[in-house]
């Protein structure tokens, strides 16, 4: 499965940061909307640990987030799990 999480929709009317999450199933060639993030996030970091996806920081307009959300792929549910010491935007994360 491939997940697209948050981001920015650029339109002639303006830029809108989004809380949307979509999942692509390559076997079915099908996109499906999933549970929304708790807040819109653009330029967020994403990491995968076990069966969970973490959305880390990012921004919404002029606001930079400190929150970290965990997505349970089996339950299709986001939970806020912690706060960063300071806001992070445009970062990349890796699990070793």
Please annotate each region the language model reported.
Residues 1-96:
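Kelch-like beta-propeller repeat domains
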């Amino acid at each position: 499965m491939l997940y697209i999480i948050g981001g920015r929709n650029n339109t002639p009317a303006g830029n809108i940061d989004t809380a949307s999450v979509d999942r692509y199933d390559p076997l079915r060639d099908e996109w499906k909307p999933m549970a929304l993030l708790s807040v819109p996030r653009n330029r967020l970091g994403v990491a995968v640990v076990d069966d969970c996806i973490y959305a880390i920081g990012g921004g919404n307009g002029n606001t930079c987030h400190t929150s970290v959300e965990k997505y349970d792929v089996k339950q299709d549910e986001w939970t806020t799990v912690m706060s960063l010491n300071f806001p992070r935007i445009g970062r990349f994360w890796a699990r070793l």
